[in-house]
Amino acid sequence: MPITSTTPEPGIVAVTVDYPPVNAIPSKAWFDLADAVTAAGANSDTRAVILRAEGRGFNAGVDIKEMQRTEGFTALIDANRGCFAAFRAVYECAVPVIAAVNGFCVGGGIGLVGNSDVIVASEDATFGLPEVERGALGAATHLSRLVPQHLMRRLFFTAATVDAATLQHFGSVHEVVSRDQLDEAALRVARDIAAKDTRVIRAAKEALNFIDVQRVNASYRMEQGFTFELNLAGVADEHRDAFVKKS
């Protein structure tokens, strides 16, 4: 199954994404991912969740080819709702979520990582939003949780990427390790959290979300509204068609 949940150690659930070749996730799978993360947190035996991926990179965002081969706006609407559901599931998961990022993390991957509680990354990890090159907007909400405001704006306007070391400098990435040590690095954090009283940790997760100065769900939905405007204007289709022709 492309979205799987395993228990590498008692109290720790690893949710794995595996959509080769680049983990560009089709619409339905975003909902599957949301369900997997929510179910993990809802289980009283779970003390921490690790979000990880197999393959070349952590996440390449939505499946643009799926959108372009589907008539009308159905695939676009499903992808937007699916991303919203998955990002929200990570943010509202009842226990802390540790993102283990390997390789590229772009588009929707930023939404997942930005809403995670702790991030560990491989040395080759890169982060960015190519949205403006796809005729879309979105996940600036989450990128702004990873880097300062002006850097976020430059990255968004230019579709540039930053490496894991840069995010570690800003404190958003906890640890940078070799790719073969990534799973163990995520497990170390998960073990530290799992060793605490889960009743307190669950209360802390809820409390930290309540005092968050950024209303991430509403903010992201606002961004999606501009994406729909670009689609209605025909701008987004032009950029997605160009992307599909190049790929």
Swiss-Prot record:
Coiled coil: none
Enzyme class: lyase
EC number(s) reported in the record: 4.1.99.-
Catalytic reaction(s) noted: (7aS)-7a-methyl-1,5-dioxo-2,3,5,6,7,7a-hexahydro-1H-indene-carboxyl-CoA + H2O = (3E)-2-(2-carboxylatoethyl)-3-methyl-6-oxocyclohex-1-ene-1-carboxyl-CoA + H(+)
Highest taxon of source: Bacteria
Gene Ontology biological process: cholesterol catabolic process; fatty acid beta-oxidation
Function: Involved in the final steps of cholesterol and steroid degradation. Catalyzes the hydrolytic ring D opening of (7aS)-7a-methyl-1,5-dioxo-2,3,5,6,7,7a-hexahydro-1H-indene-carboxyl-CoA (HIEC-CoA) to (3E)-2-(2-carboxylatoethyl)-3-methyl-6-oxocyclohex-1-ene-1-carboxyl-CoA (COCHEA-CoA).
Name of the featured protein: (7aS)-7a-methyl-1,5-dioxo-2,3,5,6,7,7a-hexahydro-1H-indene-carboxyl-CoA hydrolase
Organism: Mycobacterium tuberculosis (strain ATCC 25618 / H37Rv)
Classification lineage: Bacteria, Bacillati, Actinomycetota, Actinomycetes, Mycobacteriales
Gene that produces this protein: echA20
